[in-house]
């Protein structure tokens, strides 16, 4: 770039910063634009599937799935993890169905959780926007998009047609919210329900409510499904759950996590640690016995999980090792760099 162009660019940048504030324009490599702060989901498998160790701050996230698949449980787990990190959280309960006792069981500090039960969809989205603009709230959950009913629909008659009203309302809200969330580094999680498209002969007939705007504006979209039951003898004590990362703007998409959601307890973290530890050879399995660092920790997965629960410092150590192994970017791993260099020399 010649000197005249450099001077013109410097003058233009100076004018933009003077008018719109410092940091309104910058080079992509500057500052912390490449580092995305994340909040753990409470599930190690899902954190690894997301590729960044959790859900990204300052972004919109959509979680959808069939009824009773664990959508609200997942968001409550995220709230609990965010609160442990000292963050302020809010729950917009449009479905009027939040159970504070269940939230408390999952580790949510309900005394510190802001909660709103709005009357209309517009009111709910205005509250979300006001909280985002305040800069004091770090995480907002909206449960659910399907329950965000436009004011005109609430005030109208039962049989009235309101074509595209909710989609227009959400589209306008997304345009306003995206910038405000980014500026205040606040994450907004929208829970959504599934509907069926009529007359679809080929392909997936499932779709989410509220139009297409949320699909475009969301940085992460998670599809959560119940795949089976967790049994203790004959008693069903939880759900086998599969969570698929359908869209991911912060890492590679289409990965999936297999986990268990236990009734009244949330994610089976210890079971995940055992499974991932065996898979990545940090936990040894001989027959039904599990060993860690040469010491036997239990016969059968249930006993090994119980040992991890009773010895949280060992669980934390294994968790740390797995995160370092699976969440370090490929280019930062020395053995991978050496292997690539050797391959290049061969060619």
Swiss-Prot record:
Keyword Nucleotide-binding: yes
CDD domains registered for this protein in UniProt: RecA (cd00983)
Main location: cytoplasm
The keyword ATP-binding belongs to this UniProt entry's keyword annotation: yes
Annotated compartments: Cytoplasm
Gene Ontology MF: a single term: ATP hydrolysis activity
PROSITE patterns reported in the protein's UniProt record: RECA_1 (PS00321), RECA_2 (PS50162), RECA_3 (PS50163)
Any single biological process term in GO: SOS response
GO terms for cellular component: cytosol
Family annotation (Pfam families): RecA, RecA_C
Binding positions for ATP per the UniProt entry: 65-72
Keywords: ATP-binding, Cytoplasm, DNA damage, DNA recombination, DNA repair, DNA-binding, Nucleotide-binding, SOS response
Family: Belongs to the RecA family.
Task of the protein: Can catalyze the hydrolysis of ATP in the presence of single-stranded DNA, the ATP-dependent uptake of single-stranded DNA by duplex DNA, and the ATP-dependent hybridization of homologous single-stranded DNAs. It interacts with LexA causing its activation and leading to its autocatalytic cleavage.
HAMAP family in the cross-refs: RecA (MF_00268)
Protein name per its UniProtKB record: Protein RecA
Species in which this protein is naturally found: Aliivibrio salmonicida (strain LFI1238) (Vibrio salmonicida (strain LFI1238))
Designated gene of the protein: recA
């Amino acid at each position: 770039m010649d000197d005249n162009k450099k001077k013109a660019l410097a003058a233009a940048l100076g004018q933009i910063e003077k008018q719109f504030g410092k940091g309104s324009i910058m080079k992509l490599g500057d500052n912390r634009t490449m580092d995305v702060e994340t909040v753990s989901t409470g599930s190690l498998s899902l954190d690894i599937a997301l590729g960044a160790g959790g859900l990204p701050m300052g972004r919109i996230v959509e979680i959808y799935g069939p009824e009773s698949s664990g959508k609200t449980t997942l968001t409550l787990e995220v709230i609990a993890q965010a609160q442990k990190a000292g963050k302020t959280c809010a729950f917009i309960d449009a479905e009027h169905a939040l159970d504070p006792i269940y939230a408390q069981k999952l580790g949510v500090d309900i005394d510190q959780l802001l909660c709103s039960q709005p009357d209309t969809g517009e009111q709910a989205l205005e509250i979300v926007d006001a909280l985002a603009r305040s800069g004091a709230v770090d995480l907002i959950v909206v449960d659910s998009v399907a329950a965000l009913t436009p004011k005109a629909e609430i005030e109208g008659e039962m049989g009235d047609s309101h074509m595209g009203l909710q989609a227009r309302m959400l589209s306008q809200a997304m345009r306003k919210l995206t910038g405000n969330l980014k500026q205040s580094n606040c994450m907004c999680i929208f829970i959504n329900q599934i509907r069926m498209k009529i007359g679809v002969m080929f392909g997936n007939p499932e779709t989410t409510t509220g139009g297409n705007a949320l699909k475009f504006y969301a940085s992460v979209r998670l599809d959560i499904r119940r795949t089976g039951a967790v049994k203790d003898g004959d008693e069903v004590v939880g759900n086998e759950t599969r969570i698929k990362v359908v869209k991911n703007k912060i890492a590679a998409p289409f990965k999936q996590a297999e986990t268990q959601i236990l009734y009244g307890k949330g994610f089976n973290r210890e079971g995940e640690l055992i499974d991932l530890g065996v898979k990545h050879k940090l936990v040894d399995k001989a027959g039904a016995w599990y060993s860690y660092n040469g010491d036997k920790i239990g016969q059968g997965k249930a006993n090994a999980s119980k040992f991890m629960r009773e010895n949280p410092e060992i669980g934390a150590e294994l968790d740390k090792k797995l995160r370092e192994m699976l969440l370090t970017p490929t280019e930062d791993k020395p053995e991978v760099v050496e292997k690539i260099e050797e391959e290049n020399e061969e060619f």
